[in-house]
Amino acid sequence: MNEVYEQTCFQIISFAGTAKSCFLEAIECAKAKGDPSELLKEGNDAIQQASISHQKALTLDANGELEVVLLLIHAETILSSAETVRDLSQTIID
């Protein structure tokens, strides 16, 4: 596994995990009658960074520089989960 690929996957995992945590905290904040806007912004910023890293992985794949291995699948699963929680958090908070 090449180093750029590994680093890219770990960036996706890290940013997506941060985003998911922020969105879940925003839900709890709203339930407690607080203002979740800063947590939502932080989550959206993190998910944007995860998406940029994911695009980098897709570019590596398109250039034939990437072998699909479990690490990328794991990273994509975490990113997908974070996107789902983001969407649900808006519904729950609104």
Where is each model-derived feature located?
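Terminal alpha-helical segments
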Residues: 1-94
